Amino acid sequence: MSDLDNKEVLIALLRKRSALDILKTEGWYHIPVDTAPKPWPPTAIAFYQGTVFGKEEQYKIRYFGEVDQIDIVPRKELFPDDEENAHKAEIFYYRVQLSELHQRYKPIISYRPRRLVFIPTTWAKFQLAEQINDLFDGSPLEDRLWSALKYISVLAERQWKIFVQGHKYYLDFAVFCKHGKLAIETDGYTTHYDSLNQIDYDTWRQNEIGLDGWQFLHYTSKHVKDDWTPYLSQIQRAIDQLGGTEEPEKFRRKVGEEQGKYIVDGEEPL
């Protein structure tokens, strides 16, 4: 790989085994032009393997490559024999050609099932990541809290997507406990407190999520500054009151037993 420090890396979903076969044999990946993530284009792409890859390989990021060339082509050029999706034949896609497909010596894992599509990150974070939550490139406040939570061995999930009353929300941090769910939210003072409209939205959002059974802890950069230490005991106390964290394997079994109704980080069951 060339020098990619501070460059954009895109984590993308491999929905089918055939997508990996194409990467290995032809070296390209396709993304609909209308739904391509921002920022665009990425310098490199890494691939999150969905449930179709089976127990040993699902929820892992193993393959990656540097982007060599990007073309815009209709779907019929990518898949000329795909009669099942003939109605999509004229839709335009980015064909992202990689210079070479690489494998990480140790894959990045997701402890809990996540149905994600894209995660923009940096090459520096991708190199150091051990689990998927290490990849999120949020605010400096979120990154500091994530480091602090790992230090006290709290298995939180970053940017966890939930649906409440038909609305989609992303939680900065979700902690699944034996007797409840804890949401930990962070924001910058200037972002959320200089606007009355933002205050109104945040209040409504927190009330909606709270009525869905989530307990809330909310911190701002004005409160925390550079040191999370005084707040970690409060977070740990909230977790203890909810029975402690639920082990990821138990969470996975719960999802498996309730496929029809247990929606995990997405619009549909995994």
Q: Where are the regions a protein language model picked out?
A:
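Structured alpha/beta reader/binder surfaces that contact nucleic acids or chromatin modification marks
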Residues: 1-135, 139, 143-159, 163-167, ...
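Hydrophobic transmembrane alpha-helix bundles
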Residues: 93-101, 193-205, 253-268
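Composition-driven recognition of long, C-terminal low-complexity regions enriched in serine/threonine
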Residues: 144, 153, 157, 203-207, ...
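Acidic-and-aromatic substrate-binding clefts and catalytic sites of carbohydrate-active enzymes
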Residues: 163-168, 224-228
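Basic, amphipathic alpha-helical patches used to engage nucleic acids or provide basic targeting signals
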Residues: 177-242
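Domain-level recognition of nuclease-like catalytic cores that cleave nucleotide substrates
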Residues: 223-270
